[in-house]
Amino acid sequence: MPRAFLVRSRRPQPPNWGHLPDQLRGDAYIPDCSSLGGPPAQQSSSVRDPWTAQPTQGNLTSAPRGPGTLGCPLCPKAFPLQRMLTRHLKCHSPVRRHLCRCCGKGFHDAFDLKRHMRTHTGIRPFRCSACGKAFTQRCSLEAHLAKVHGQPASYAYRERREKLHVCEDCGFTSSRPDTYAQHRALHRAA
């Protein structure tokens, strides 16, 4: 298994999924995270988020770095849109608002936590139609298709791809939001 998919655990011997074929890895295996002892203790309240808690830090302004770009005041990166700069500024903050309940790793963005949780659950919703190998991320599937099967991306640069709705409880996938909503209702009813 590539190192990118390995996650450190406080468990003495983490579960080894290497012997499982991809067909079984795609099915839901949700470990009991309570056995890991929960996430590490929150940071003390004396540690403050410099981006929201202190008004004196509110004077961080983005310096234009060229026509139509906004520069980060803390590093040399530049962005075409304010929302992209705002998202980037979170990477400089020491506070991680989204904590993994299994290992305690923190993330700035809720989606990054959702993607990380797949390393614990084993859910691999992106399956190769040619060989059946499954992946946790769409970009990994696309790289596999290009390298192994020689299939170039079937979309143009910056073209929006079809969204895949993934149930993080059981691994169910659907490209239709109404089908996904019906499936989620089954989990709530149970």
UniProtKB/Swiss-Prot annotation:
**Pfam families noted in UniProt:** zf-C2H2, zf-H2C2_2
Q: Got any disulfides in this one, which pairs?
A: none
Q: Which parts of the sequence are annotated with region: Disordered?
A: 1-21, 35-65
Q: What GO cellular component term, any one, is given? A: nucleus
**Keyword Magnesium in record:** no
Zinc finger motifs (C2H2-type), residue ranges:
70-92, 98-120, 126-149, 165-187
- Localisation: Nucleus
Q: Which domain of life is it from?
A: Eukaryota
* Residue stretches of biased makeup (Polar residues): 41-62
Where mainly found?
A: nucleus
Q: GO BP, one example? A: epidermal cell differentiation
Keyword Isomerase part of the UniProt annotation: no
Could you list this entry's UniProt keywords, alphabetically sorted. Metal-binding, Nucleus, Repeat, Transcription, Transcription regulation, Zinc, Zinc-finger
Output one GO MF annotation: zinc ion binding
Q: What does this protein do?
A: May act as a transcription regulator.
Matches recorded under PANTHER family: TRANSCRIPTION FACTOR OVO-LIKE PROTEIN 3-RELATED, ZINC FINGER PROTEIN WITH KRAB AND SCAN DOMAINS
Q: Which family does it belong to?
A: Belongs to the krueppel C2H2-type zinc-finger protein family.
Name of protein? Putative transcription factor ovo-like protein 3
Species the sequence originates in: Homo sapiens (Human)
